[in-house]
Amino acid sequence: MASPKEILKQVQDDDMPHWRLPAHPANRRSMRFFSDNAAAVHPRVMQAIQAADRLDTAYDGDRLSRSLDGRLSALFGTEVAALWVPSGTAANCLALAALCPPHGGIVCHRDAHIQNDEGGAPEFYTHGAKLFLAEGEGAKLTPAAIEAVLDAIPDDVHRVQPHAISITNATEYGRVYTPAEVAAIGDLARGRGLGFHMDGARFANAVATLGCTPAAVTWQAGVDALSFGFVKNGAMSAECLVFFDPDLAAVTRYRRKRAGLLLSKGRYLAAQVLAMLDDDLWLDTARAANARAATLAAAGGDRLIHPVEANEVFLRATPDEAAALRAKGFDFYDWAPGEIRLVTAWDSDEGDVGALADAIAAL
């Protein structure tokens, strides 16, 4: 049996180009474009966290947590039930558990975060629901792609039956669904009797691009549950699960507790969400991130793999070209062979963005 040290070495030696950051020269400052998860916490969020010290009610009984429903109902223009959670995976999986029974299935894109990057958590939290994988350019689903999956599933007791659809907006490749595109899927979901979930880890970036109301691209388009992301956009550790059918939240409150996600000092999570909502800070930070991505996209030219509609830029780059960028101090992830991913954030330094744009143009 391998020793812990041997196991650790094996893990470190495994080929993990998707997540490993090759070291840049030690004498150069790192300019990070690998993930908006690494972005700084916005000062106004920090202030809100500190202000929450003055409250002492535990779990979700404090006035900040209790105000979330009202604040988000006002934002979306309809009655909602909102639950804070400490991660996007938690938000996604609790939403899916509310929409899909253990014996059911969820249609999602082959490259969806719930399929590739949540470590089996969707299956765990739903107690065994199956993920049905669909195709689509830029990780976007269409009604036709979803129907192709649904039509291939016979109404047979021996086969898992679909119960929900999950899309990501903005997608894992930085593409944005318009309200009309979401509504087309929403119509399909209603017609088929399926729940409809939106993974909104970068929901703010999508809304900033669209210039529409949050309502237009969610409940007005048929979405039942939204994982409203804040961590990538200026928060520290708070995401918000928004149910447009408040009845869905009733049992989810118990699932959140059972899953160990009901933090005793939850007021600090609520404080972050509320700070992001104040004066539309969530949109201001998303617009800043999107604008910086647009600068990189302009430099990318023919190297662009996907249209840049949010804050992610995917470029064609040979290993030598990627190494040349890293030698100049830029940090980013390798993606597929011959591809790199650059992610901007609300706090991306404009000088760094300009330098990277120049370096890309010079390749």
Model-inferred region functions:
Residues 28-329, 333-339, 343-348, 352, ...:
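Conserved PLP-enzyme active-site core in the AAT-like
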Residues 1-5, 12-13, 18, 23:
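A cross-taxon signal for low-complexity, glycine/charged-rich
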Residues 9-11, 46:
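Intrinsically disordered, low-complexity regions enriched in polar/acidic and amide residues
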Residues 3-7, 25-34:
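N-terminal intrinsically disordered, low-complexity tails enriched in polar/charged
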